[in-house]
Amino acid sequence: MAKLTCGLIQMGLKGDTSMAPDRIRDLMIEAHIPYIEQAAAKGVQVLCFQEVFTQPYFCPGQDRKWYAAAERIPDGHTTRLMQEYVGQAKARVQLA
């Protein structure tokens, strides 16, 4: 039977909901990078993140500023960054 090594990253919001969504996204990605690298070093093949891992869960109000958190797939900022890191690690990432 083949062995599959999986990992899960879950963390609290970095920053504050008064910040712009792109700033929150950048802080959250920055906070995840060491864990991605650690998972790769441990041979993780499938790495899962929590839902909406780059923003507050769910947007904390009806403020239109949260519309800016939406990203295009597959050419959005987060997708491109994750492809770069995951490609180096030869792993797979589940983005929800």
PLM feature spans:
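Hydrophobic structural segments
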Residues: M1-A96
